[in-house]
């Protein structure tokens, strides 16, 4: 059985990792051992943050809706309860967008929520 030399495969594997670590600071972009750890950790951060992004955006939308609802004389929880009673099915993403860019439309929606609460 002939001797197996793995130089080509090792070089290919190293190049792949170092390419992924391009732009990292110092040894993290140059030294294979360090770069490999950095790439693995980066992947863990990516995985975690793809899930956190959804939570963070929802929290941002709620904060914006709350601020706009309070300007119109209603708290966030009462506003959402009013929307449910009025059978208005607009998601928080769209409500937050309306609160920021279409203030008159948002005010009209708040009024409908107030009417359904009364």
UniProtKB/Swiss-Prot annotation:
Key words, A-Z: Ribonucleoprotein, Ribosomal protein, RNA-binding, rRNA-binding
Intrachain S-S bonds: none
GO cellular component: ribonucleoprotein complex; ribosome
InterPro entries: Ribosomal_bL20, RIBOSOMAL_L20_CS, Ribosomal_protein_bL20_C
SUPFAM superfamilies tied to this protein: Ribosomal protein L20 (SSF74731)
GO BP field: ribosomal large subunit assembly; translation
Matches recorded under Pfam families: Ribosomal_L20
GO molecular function term, any single one: structural constituent of ribosome
Keyword field contains Membrane: no
Family indicated by similarity: Belongs to the bacterial ribosomal protein bL20 family.
Entry function: Binds directly to 23S ribosomal RNA and is necessary for the in vitro assembly process of the 50S ribosomal subunit. It is not involved in the protein synthesizing functions of that subunit.
NCBIfam families: rplT_bact (TIGR01032)
Protein name, entry field: Large ribosomal subunit protein bL20
Annotated source species: Marinomonas sp. (strain MWYL1)
Taxonomic placement: Bacteria, Pseudomonadati, Pseudomonadota, Gammaproteobacteria, Oceanospirillales
